[in-house]
Structures are given as structure tokens and as C-alpha cells.
UniProtKB/Swiss-Prot annotation:
One of its GO terms (molecular function) is zinc ion binding. Pfam families: SGL. Substrate binds at residues 100, 102, 120. It catalyses: D-glucono-1,5-lactone + H2O = D-gluconate + H(+). Binds 1 divalent metal cation per subunit. Most active with Zn(2+) and Mn(2+) ions. The physiological cofactor is most likely Ca(2+) or Mg(2+). This is Regucalcin. It comes from Danio rerio (Zebrafish).
Amino acid sequence: MSSIKVECVIKEKNEVGESPVWEEKDSSLLYVDITGQKVSRWSSLTKQIESMNTEKLVGCVVPRQAGGYVIAEGTRFAFVDWVKRSITAVAEVNEKPNTRFNDGKVDPAGRFFAGTMSMDMKPDVVDAALYNLQPDHSVVRHFDQVHLSNGLDWSLDHRVFYYIDSLAFMVEAFDYDIQTGGLSNRRTVYKMEKDEGIPDGMCIDTEGKLWVACFNGGRVLRIDPQTGKRLQTVKLPAERITSCCFGGKDYSDLYITSAYIGMDAEALAKQPEAGCTFKVTGLGVKGIPPYSYTG
């Protein structure tokens, strides 16, 4: 097995870096800074970054098949025209006060799933929900009673939906109906250990194993959702790890975003790479290309 290497490749720091998505056509990484209210693209070829400001706190960004991107910002879905630098609202969700969209991803049929979170971030507050934007621009609400909606992905056969509500400290699974987008048979596939931090973003590899970013845990875990076992831990030089995705040639590199929000000067001095985006090579596994929203 080749040796694992962790490298800070995007040194421009994000207060809350999130939602990394690999764009194969131009070898670039798409991501957001939630509290910085911007969407960015980093070219792995030129090392240059292009950014665009959003109008609200932006939880996530996904590619759109028709061109440009779709974001979930504030309590709405919106289209992004990267060329014109314009944002067009598509659909608003009827959320409780003091909530906003957080992480999201496109399913294999082209639906854009995204969940919300309470800005209070208290264990007893369950005001959030999971939604998806349909290709016809209508919105489906799947379930509520969520603390802090976060990482999500689908099994390789598209029959299982994996989901993280961060403050539940677990990874869950649902039976998934790819024809309707329906969810059923909710169950737990992994419970976080105390030293692993808060489960945040997540992605899947070609072996069907899950990679879970651990906020305040300084690591990414590889989990077998069939057995509930942790298979591997990759430690990072930053505590506030937020999300991850595979990219690079053959999708063999793991890109990992991080945050520096809430860290004081002493903590930042100890973790000078907090807020950086890392690339991990030598893992010996590959990911799958992201899906694009079809609406």
C-alpha cells in the first residue's frame, strides 16, 4: 500500500469551508465558505482561485447540467450563473425562524437534496428538516425534527441513502427509491466515539465505504456501513474538519475542507492550517464523479 500524504493545497483560508465538489472538465475544486458568503473554484492546474459572493449564508453548491451551479443559501435554492456572476432565486422553503440551509448533494437521478439547521445549535432544538429541489423546481420536504442536517450520499446501487444529523452523533441509512426520491426504513449504521468529534460532511468511495469528516475531531473516518465498523482514520493538522470529496485523476485524491470559526488567537497559532483545504493522496481507493442537478 502506498504511503498516505496530507497536504494543504488551498492556502486561502475559509472561515467555514464546506461542500467540496470536483469538476472533472477543468480539473477544479468547487466549494463554499458558509459564513464568508462565497462560492469558490480552485484550479488544480493553475492553482488560481475564482470566487463569487452570495447574498446569504451559503450551505452548499452543486453543478447544474444546464450550466452554472445551484446553491442552497439562507432558506432558498438559487441558480448561479458563473459567467454573468448572477444569482437567481428558484424556490424558498417555509422554515422556522433562525434556521438556514446547510449541506447538500445531488442524487443519481438529478434531484438536489439539502437540509437545514438551527442557528442555535443546541442539542434540544430540532427545528430543521431535509428537503430536495425537484427537476421541475418544486420542493419536497422529507422529514423534520432535525438538529443540524449535514453529510449525505447514496449507495453505489442507489438503493440506500446515507445521512448525518450532526448533533445526533451518528450516521444513518434509509431505503431509497430512486424513481420517486422516497425514503423509508430509517436506521443507524455508525455511532461516533467520544474522541471522534462531530460528524459533518460525507462521501462514498467505489467500494461502497463512507468517508466522514469530523468537526472538532481533526480527522476523517472511513466507515463500512454494512458492518458499522470504522476501517481507517486519517488525521489532519486542523481540528475543525468540515467535509470531503474525491477528485483528481481517476478520483483517487481525497479533498478535505476545514474551518477556523470560533478559534481564538492561541488556538490559531497552534493550528496555522485551520481553514485550509487539504488533499490526501495514497489512500488506495477512489471516489465517484458527482451528479449534476437536472432542472
